[in-house]
């Protein structure tokens, strides 16, 4: 959150990714507890167009965070890439009209 506050203004960074590590120096390991701090898109995106057409915009994984929740009609966060594939397949089996964005 501190990095997001600092990286604003004229030269703002669109997305800050904070990923905690565990372990000792020389043996750090990444955790899956990543957090994204994104700015909303400055202009309409394809997602806006889809949503304005009364279609679904389903975000699987970090998509909701990447777009700062803008225009996402439904979202599910995943634990890893394979979970993302599985969740995408689950959504494909449901009655959806629109975009499944993984």
Regions found by a protein language model. Name each.
Residues 1-102:
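Feature captures the catalytic ectodomains and active-site-proximal regions of enzymes
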